Amino acid sequence: KISNEIKIAEAKYQKQLEELRRQEESKNNNGKNNGNGNSSTPTGSGYLMKPINGGTISANGYYSSGKFHGAIDYAVSTGTPVYAAAAGVVMSTANLSGSYGTYVVIRHANGLQSYYGHGTYGSICVSPGQTVSKGQQIMLSGSTGNSSGPHLHFEVRVSPYTYNGYATGYGQDSRVNPANYM
């Protein structure tokens, strides 16, 4: 029964993503041919917006110790609004005591997934399966989970989605540098 429910939910997500993909291609192309026929490869194109107003970058892929981090951390005050970096479908949300703490994961039409971690407990204002627009508020920043202070953990992954806790750089799992898509 659960397997069937998962298949139904996945089909629903795929339908929503396909509609978003069509809308984005229409908006991006404006009737023009971009030369390669593929408007969904956004390297450095501004596909993603900065998910938070203000804040300073406290980690950009690596911690100050040199250890790989795989995300951009924006140091901001607790309660700062966090926004969807691009249109997509909310895949999951949770309020965990460890790891990402309060987090949201959004799948985008081009195959990217964006992760927003360490939000304020109870501040998530979207639900799994919900379609969100670029710039829509999804939660408030905080310091939940494995966090050393108030900030937004902003991580981006590409399909197929894998995670390697021992990775020492981008390319060793599905995490990519978010700056390449902003």
PLM segments and residue spans:
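Short acidic/polar mixed-charge low-complexity motifs
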Residues: 80, 110-112, 172
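Zn2+-dependent peptidoglycan hydrolase active-site motif and core
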Residues: 67-70, 84-130, 144, 150-158
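Acidic, glycine-rich catalytic/binding loops that coordinate metals and/or anionic ligands
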Residues: 130, 155-182
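Short glycine/threonine/proline-enriched tight-turn/helix- or strand-capping micro-motif at secondary-structure
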Residues: 54-86
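Alpha-helical oligomerization segments with coiled-coil/rod-like character
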Residues: 1-42
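Terminal peptide-recognition signature
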Residues: 57, 74, 88, 135, ...
